[in-house]
């Protein structure tokens, strides 16, 4: 467990405060988990973003009438902190009985508080239900590897030695799997996700990728660190010209988390999958 997470509200009984309470936000420094992967804030081998989507966003108009919407938050992957998910939920719940004179006032408040917690500017979009409904759900790009016939026996810890590639062949391809699962390091609750690997480099053995991804099944870590570990293990093996790894997780507590990591600048969309 991350030492800072022990002091977070995650896994504890909490009072749900219904009026504006930014002190609910609990930042967790990324540095400890980066150190486990052998990287520092100065040597990050990726660019990217963590998209958070909130489906329980509500506040009051000056008339007292409530409004509901969907929040989209973009936290830079190089921000000093992640925001612990239950604290994020408690903070958003604190807006439920809070009056905002305009949508702009609400958005400015969210940007200020979330940026302060993350330690870097956080992008905020407040979207109408009609807008999100019209967008619908999308399928992941590339080839799904979940139908491959593989024998699997390890579920406890990620095992990069399972990965194999053809060093004599360079390919450019996109692969995806819906079989990513890990566990919350604090509560032990399951985190279900779908993962995409886009790369140009040594030809990755698809079956080995599937067995590797399933090896996360009982692993305890936060969403962001799981994606960073996958990214680094593939980068070390494939020596790619470019590599992008991203995962879209099933929501819990009204929030879903979607980390993106890439060798270069990316402009990811934030479109929902069928399980989101």
Curated annotation (Swiss-Prot):
Q: Which domain of life is it from?
A: Bacteria
> Where substrate is bound, by residue?
83-85, 223-224
Listed under GO biological process in this entry are: queuosine biosynthetic process; tRNA modification
Listed under GO cellular component are:
cytoplasm
Q: What is the uppermost EC class here?
A: oxidoreductase
Kindly state which keywords UniProt assigns to this record, in alphabetical order: Cytoplasm, NADP, Oxidoreductase, Queuosine biosynthesis
Reaction(s) catalysed by this chain's protein: 7-aminomethyl-7-carbaguanine + 2 NADP(+) = 7-cyano-7-deazaguanine + 2 NADPH + 3 H(+)
Q: Tell me the GO molecular function terms.
A: preQ1 synthase activity
Under the heading Gene3D superfamilies, the entry gives: 3.30.1130.10
In short, the EC number is 1.7.1.13
Q: Which InterPro entries match?
A: GTP-CH-I_C/QueF, NADPH_dep_7-cyano-7-deazaG_red, QueF, QueF_N, QueF_type2
A Pfam family assignment: QueF_N
Location in the cell reads:
Cytoplasm
- Active-site annotation: 184, 191
Pathway listed for it is:
tRNA modification; tRNA-queuosine biosynthesis
Locate the residues binding NADPH: 85-86, 252-253
Q: Into which family does the record put it?
A: Belongs to the GTP cyclohydrolase I family. QueF type 2 subfamily.
The UniProt function text for this chain reads: Catalyzes the NADPH-dependent reduction of 7-cyano-7-deazaguanine (preQ0) to 7-aminomethyl-7-deazaguanine (preQ1).
On subunit structure and binding partners, the annotation says:
Homodimer.
Which HAMAP family does UniProt cross-reference here? QueF_type2 (MF_00817)
According to UniProt, the name of this protein is NADPH-dependent 7-cyano-7-deazaguanine reductase
Q: Which organism is it from?
A: Pseudomonas putida (strain GB-1)
């Amino acid at each position: 467990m991350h030492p800072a997470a022990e002091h977070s509200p995650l896994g504890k009984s909490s009072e749900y405060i219904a009026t504006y309470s930014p002190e609910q936000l609990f930042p967790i420094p990324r540095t400890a988990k980066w150190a486990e992967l052998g990287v520092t804030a100065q040597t990050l081998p990726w660019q990217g973003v963590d998209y958070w989507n909130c489906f329980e966003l509500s506040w009051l108009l000056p008339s007292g009438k409530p409004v509901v919407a969907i929040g989209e938050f973009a936290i830079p992957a190089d921000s000093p902190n992640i925001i612990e998910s239950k604290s994020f939920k408690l903070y958003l719940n604190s807006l439920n009985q809070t009056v905002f004179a305009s949508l702009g006032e609400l958005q400015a408040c969210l940007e200020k508080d979330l940026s302060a917690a993350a330690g870097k500017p956080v992008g905020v979009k407040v979207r109408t239900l009609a807008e999100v409904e019209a967008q619908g759900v999308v399928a992941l790009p590339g080839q799904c590897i979940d139908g491959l016939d593989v024998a699997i026996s390890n579920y406890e810890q990620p095992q990069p030695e399972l990965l194999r590639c053809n060093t004599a062949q360079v390919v450019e391809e996109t692969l995806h799997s819906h079989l990513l699962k890990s566990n919350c390091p604090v509560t032990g609750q399951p985190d279900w996700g779908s993962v995409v690997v886009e790369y140009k480099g040594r030809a990755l053995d698809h079956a080995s990728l599937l067995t590797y991804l399933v090896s996360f099944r009982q692993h305890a870590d936060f969403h962001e660190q799981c994606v960073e570990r996958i990214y680094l293990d593939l980068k070390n093996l494939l020596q790619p010209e470019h590599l992008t790894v991203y995962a879209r997780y099933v929501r819990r507590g009204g929030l879903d988390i979607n980390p993106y990591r890439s060798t270069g600048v990316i402009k990811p969309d934030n479109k929902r999958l069928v399980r989101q």
